[in-house]
Amino acid sequence: MSLNSAEINFIKAVKAGIHGENAMLKDADYSALFETAMQQKLLPFVFEAVRKTSALQQNQALFAAEKQQVINQVLSQTLRSAEFEETYKKFLEEGLRPIVVKGRICSRLYPLRDHRLSADDDIFVSENDFLPCHNILMQNGFTADCPENELLSKDEVSYTKENGTAYIEMHRRLFDSSKDMHDDLNSFFDDAHAHLTSTEGFFTMNPHDNMLYLILHAYKHFVCSGIGIRQFCDIGLWSKNYTADIDWPLLYEQCQKVRAAKFAAAIFKIANEYLGIEFDLPQPWSESDISCVPLLKDSICGGIYGSNDYTRLHSSTITLNAVRSGRDGKRRGILSSVFPPKRYMENKYSYVKRHSWLLPAAWGQRIFRYIRETAENKDDSAAESVKLAKKRIELMKTYDII
């Protein structure tokens, strides 16, 4: 298996962009290149890599339109960052220390930090700090995405502000506890709040725990619908900047526990060999000769978090069941994808938690939504979802996830 010319050009552009360099591409279709970059939330970096090359003169109208897109995206990110920083100060003033994770912490590793786009800002709070942090957000004009009486049953709550740009997700647990396979991922971070690090005015996890979280977060999305190239960039840059602060043997042991070691090794290989992020991996990581190309192709095809199309999104229930079966040894048929267990449905349809007898109605609502979505998207069908799910299950077997 190998990358096609369009995929090669895209990876070259990303590599150049995250290093602040120019990308000289061969026979590139720049319209397709920018479309892929949009899907991957990497347009600012890709555009920055090609805007000073001879391609500009040959595609002036296209480049002018993309330039405006980039300006809008970066400006929006800058405003969102500033608003989040002001909000975070409110937590600190009250003696609260929510942990900042993902995009906000990773963006500072890039040459142009606001080119690293984030749809939201994520904070991880202790049980004791959850309601105080919620109250501060509400007092500062934010609105929660769930009613007050459901707050304590949620793993995460999203907050938005009218006429504001910030979108904050507050996590009581870093992984969704309604999906059985993620419960043991949460256990790795039980003591995270006892080992905080201060970084540029934010509290975050120590470098090792952050590395583990980035890998497991990527793993969570991969076994669902897929992951994007941006996550490879984040993990690679984190590895490079914090090589000496990461306990690599322990990291391998932790990843092995959840069958994510080969998957992580493939990501490190992509970062090293395709994205030009240089860092030395000690044993046992350095011993892996796993092919990373299948993972790379799947990630380019799927877009950020595998959200490029409904076929891929709908295939996720099948792949998730396959992963669960591999983890607990319990065989699950296609019916478990159509009729998920009550614990899963409670998280998606809150009325099931209040009235368990409405579970059949929630199943019906879920099926109706699927029928509506497939009707609106002619390229999507149950057969195509099953076909893609089988293909992705084989991919997961390549990395010993299943």
Please tell me what each predicted stretch does:
Residues 1-119, 125-402:
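Conserved NTP-donor binding/palm subdomain of two-metal-ion nucleotidyltransferases/polymerases, i.e.
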